[in-house]
Amino acid sequence: GDEEDEVEETLPVAEEGREKSCTTWRNSCMHNDKGCCFPWSCVCWSQTVSRNSSRKEKKCQCRLW
């Protein structure tokens, strides 16, 4: 009926918002297996804070591919 059509229309908008929030940087991939990153993977790596610094920081990001 009409109710089903309304549900279909609102879903893509929610998905779009979720995808945008999923690409934000994060400090950890923990607790994401059933959350934002699914069905994508969350990847972490270390990188130096700046070119003339040896200090490293951990960066994590959901990969949408």
UniProtKB/Swiss-Prot annotation:
Expressed by the venom gland. It is found in: Secreted. It comes from the Eukaryota. One of its GO terms (cellular component) is extracellular region. One of its GO terms (molecular function) is toxin activity. Keywords: Calcium channel impairing toxin, Disulfide bond, Ion channel impairing toxin, Knottin, Neurotoxin, Secreted, Toxin, Voltage-gated calcium channel impairing toxin. Modulates Cav2.1/CACNA1A voltage-gated calcium channels (P/Q-type currents) in rat cerebellar Purkinje cells and hippocampal CA1-CA3 neurons. At saturating concentrations (>10 nM) decelerates activation kinetics and slightly increases peak amplitude without affecting deactivation kinetics. In vivo, does not cause death when intravenously injected into mice. In rat models, through its activity on Cav2.1/CACNA1A, has an ameliorative effect on memory defects provoked by hyperstimulation of N-methyl-D-aspartate receptors (NMDARs) in the hippocampus. The presence of a 'disulfide through disulfide knot' structurally defines this protein as a knottin. Belongs to the neurotoxin omega-lctx family. According to the nomenclature proposed by King and colleagues (2008), 'Gsp(267)' comes from the species name 'Geolycosa sp (strain A267TDLS2-KZARNA)'. This species has been reclassified since that study, as indicated in the work of Oparin and colleagues (2016). This is Omega-lycotoxin-Am1f. It comes from Alopecosa marikovskyi (Wolf spider).
